[in-house]
């Protein structure tokens, strides 16, 4: 099977128009006519990940976070991104990224988190009024426009966040410990612990602070996400339990989503979940 067939399968599952307007999901590096020798699935593409792909005989890397995000002005040896690009090109390794299109897809990143927390059929939110997109970023570049990189503007994305209902209410401290255990997180940053039980849980992998008002309006008892701006913690004690577990920790099971899509849609393609830990943050 050719790399382009794997790419097409991934984009059927998480169409590129689902990505935010500032994103750069899709093909990053390489030629897609080559036969797939193996697909290495990862959260981030680093030099170590490329080395692992070589070692494990994979000529395709599928990541969640794009390697090429803010654009390259040169391909030399000035930083880790440039070195990673050069290494992948030299070794004829194709790099594909499924980022906010996978975040926003039905059965994507947030559904996987819900599955980890014990619910396989979480609810998607009702259509929300227009608001800003996830994060702050510059407008599309001419090259992105030429490649058809678009966002969905103010339309609701099906998986931008999801709501699950726990089988039984949990005391807040027990809930936080449960999330840490299920998501393999070392710690969690929270606001004041709730005095009432938690049962309705909103989920957004990665940086989800832009959704806080939405999940409160939807009646969530708790909000599990990967990043939260300091000032967002203020003013919500006893209104909602904020549970921030780290960007990497909230998304590192995304490789299982990618694996399931490829194995279902591209039978015979060998999938390897990367063993390289690319989390740049260390808790000391």
Where are these regions (language model features)?
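Hydrophobic structural segments
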Residues: 1-284
């Amino acid at each position: 099977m050719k790399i382009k067939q794997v790419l097409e399968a991934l984009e059927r599952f998480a169409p590129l128009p689902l990505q935010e307007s500032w994103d750069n999901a899709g093909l990053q590096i390489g030629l897609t006519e080559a036969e797939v020798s193996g697909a290495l699935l990862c959260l981030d593409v680093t030099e170590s990940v490329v080395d692992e792909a070589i070692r494990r005989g994979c000529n395709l890397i599928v990541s969640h976070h794009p390697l090429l995000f803010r654009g390259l002005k040169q391909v030399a040896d000035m930083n880790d991104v440039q070195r990673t690009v050069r290494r992948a090109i030299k070794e004829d390794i194709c790099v594909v990224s499924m980022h906010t299109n996978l975040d926003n897809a039905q059965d994507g990143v947030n559904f996987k988190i819900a599955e980890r927390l014990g619910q396989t059929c979480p609810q998607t939110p009702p259509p929300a009024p227009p608001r800003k997109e996830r994060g702050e970023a510059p407008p599309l570049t001419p090259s992105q426009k030429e490649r058809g990189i678009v966002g969905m503007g103010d339309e609701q994305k099906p998986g931008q966040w999801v709501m699950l209902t726990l089988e039984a209410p949990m005391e807040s401290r027990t809930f936080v410990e449960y999330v840490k255990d299920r998501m393999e997180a070392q710690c969690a940053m929270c606001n004041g612990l709730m005095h009432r039980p938690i049962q309705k849980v909103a989920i957004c992998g990665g940086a989800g602070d832009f959704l806080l008002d939405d999940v409160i309006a939807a009646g969530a008892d708790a909000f599990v996400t990967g990043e939260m701006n300091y000032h967002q913690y203020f003013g919500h004690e006893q209104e909602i339990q904020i549970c921030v577990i780290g960007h990497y920790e909230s998304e590192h099971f995304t490789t299982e989503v990618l694996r399931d899509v490829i194995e279902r849609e591209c039978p015979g393609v060998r999938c390897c979940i990367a063993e390289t830990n690319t989390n740049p943050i260390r808790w000391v």
